[in-house]
């Protein structure tokens, strides 16, 4: 925890100055975007004031500072009190930063420039000067802020000198409307609204910062070709696309949404997947109390990747059977893990240095339940018989049983489904669950209050964990949601702050 706050005074002062200045005059993302060039490769908007209020950040940071006792932590708490306290001289709304030609910029607005000189962290770490109509604040060669009236521009980069910053200020301030990123309708549709954070990435533009985009495409194509795949069209579409992401925080949930769009606003992932969605029946083979669930509906290229991976890893005599099985997959697969309360086991260990034995308690993952399900486009009985023959085993009532010292694994065919499991048919399944409805991908992690995972964590840490995490992909976007139950705080961010504080107190 202490290491978290070992930051330099210059970095702290830069952050303070940037947060103070990115305020007031521009009250919405759109106001800032009109001064951002259309070919910016990275844009981020954060509603700082709203996030601070939701998380009760001022109070919580003070608690952490008192707990840690480090000066850097106390400085950070002082900063938040200055910015977000009741007597704050500024009104924080949106912070918008962007990348352009290798440097990072942020438009800055403040009502009272003179107040900056009264803040110790600024006065001690920034050198103030004037040039023509500009007031200049310089921390070092990597950070420079130039101000003209109430407007200012922060520039961060390898050679962020005041002359370059002044030129950038004038160029961006006089930006013609059709040269601003605000002129991009797709950008504006996806980068403003009620969410708390917005992010835009130009993939091709960003990759060009580290080398030739064309060479990177060729390298990726070669890697896929080595796996027996030809996906140049997909690579081109992904590399030439744009990431749009947003995050929101409510009382019960933190939600991150992300889309990959082309320059016409078409969803690239949806183009690759087509109209395939997860089979509704497949979850019925998984335990209702599964701690972790993953389900997907693979596109054709995904099936080819599995076939190639099996071909590269299996013995020669098994390759033909495995290939036949993969060819009959329709792309729907699901996997579940059920963690039980008995997962912790006492084991005897040998210590080489002391030449003695000792006991320890650690997870025994063989005590978990595992189930893998694949849907096929034909009945798989004959193929399972071929597999059993290779393994030297028989098929009994459509089931192959593979004995093991630690667990028994069964492989069975149930109509169009192949099920591999060490626990058999669950007493209660996820049949009827809407988790995978209209989804192309689902991942679910259960740490709800009465779950085995939550009980195990709560036994080790003094926290009351009650949460589930869900990652889904559908025709619109990818979405990650962390949901907390019975939250006694006003927002999930404050809930997370309290978890951190409780864990820190236990150390």
Model feature map: region roles:
Residues 26-140, 180-364, 500-507:
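Structural boundary/hinge residues at secondary-structure and domain interfaces
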Residues 49, 158-163, 202-208, 261-265, ...:
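Hydrophobic lipid-interacting interfaces of membrane-associated proteins
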Residues 12-23:
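Bacterial N-terminal signal peptides
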Residues 110-149, 363-366, 377-416, 439-463:
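Short Gly/Thr-rich strand-loop-strand
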Residues 90, 328-382, 389-391, 397-408, ...:
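Long compositionally biased, domain-poor regions of proteins
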């Amino acid at each position: 925890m202490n290491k978290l706050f070992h930051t330099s005074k210059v970095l702290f002062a830069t952050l303070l100055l940037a947060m103070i200045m990115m305020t007031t005059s521009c009250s919405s993302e759109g106001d800032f975007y009109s001064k951002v060039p259309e070919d910016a490769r990275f844009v981020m908007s954060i509603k700082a004031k709203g996030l601070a209020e939701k998380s009760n950040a001022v109070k919580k940071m003070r608690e952490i500072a008192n707990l840690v006792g480090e000066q850097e932590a106390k400085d950070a708490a002082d900063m938040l009190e200055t910015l977000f306290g009741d007597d704050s001289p500024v009104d924080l709304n949106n912070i918008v930063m962007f990348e352009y030609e290798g440097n990072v910029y942020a438009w800055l607005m403040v009502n009272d420039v003179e107040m900056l000189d009264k803040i110790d962290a600024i006065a001690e770490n920034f050198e103030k000067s004037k040039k023509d109509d500009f007031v200049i604040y310089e921390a070092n060669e990597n950070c420079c802020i130039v101000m003209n009236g109430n407007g200012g521009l922060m520039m961060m980069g390898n050679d962020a000198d005041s002359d370059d910053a002044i030129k950038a200020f004038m160029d961006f301030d006089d930006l013609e409307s059709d040269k601003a990123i605000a002129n991009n309708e797709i950008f504006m549709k996806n980068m403003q609204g009620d969410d708390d954070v917005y992010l835009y990435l130009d993939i091709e533009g960003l990759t060009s910062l580290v080398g030739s985009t064309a060479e990177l495409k060729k390298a990726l194509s070669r890697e896929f070709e080595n796996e027996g795949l030809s996906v140049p069209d997909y690579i081109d579409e992904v590399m030439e696309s744009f990431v749009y992401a947003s995050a929101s925080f409510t009382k019960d949930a933190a939600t991150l949404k992300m889309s990959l769009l082309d320059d016409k606003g078409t969803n690239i992932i949806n183009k690759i997947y087509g109209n395939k969605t997860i089979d509704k029946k497949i979850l019925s083979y998984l335990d209702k109390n599964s701690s972790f669930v993953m389900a997907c509906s693979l596109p054709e290229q995904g099936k080819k990747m599995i076939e190639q991976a099996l071909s590269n890893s299996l013995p020669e005599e098994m390759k033909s059977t495995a290939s036949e099985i993969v060819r009959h997959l329709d792309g729907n697969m699901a996997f579940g893990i059920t963690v039980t309360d008995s997962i912790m086991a006492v084991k005897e260990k040998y210590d080489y240095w002391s030449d003695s034995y000792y006991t320890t308690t650690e997870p025994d993952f063989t005590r978990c339940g595992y189930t893998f399900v694949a849907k096929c486009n034909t009945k798989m009985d004959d193929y399972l018989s071929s597999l059993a023959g290779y393994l030297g085993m028989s098929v009994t009532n459509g089931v192959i049983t593979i004995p093991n010292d630690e667990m028994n694994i069964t492989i069975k065919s149930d109509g169009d489904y192949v099920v591999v499991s060490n626990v058999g048919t669950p007493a209660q399944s996820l049949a009827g669950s809407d988790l995978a409805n209209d989804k192309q991908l689902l991942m679910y992690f259960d740490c709800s209050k009465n779950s085995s995972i939550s009980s195990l964590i709560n036994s080790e840490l003094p926290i009351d964990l009650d949460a589930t995490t869900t990652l889904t992909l559908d025709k619109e976007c990818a979405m990650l949601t962390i949901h907390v139950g019975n939250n006694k705080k006003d927002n999930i961010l404050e809930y997370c702050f309290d978890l951190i504080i409780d864990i820190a107190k236990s150390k």
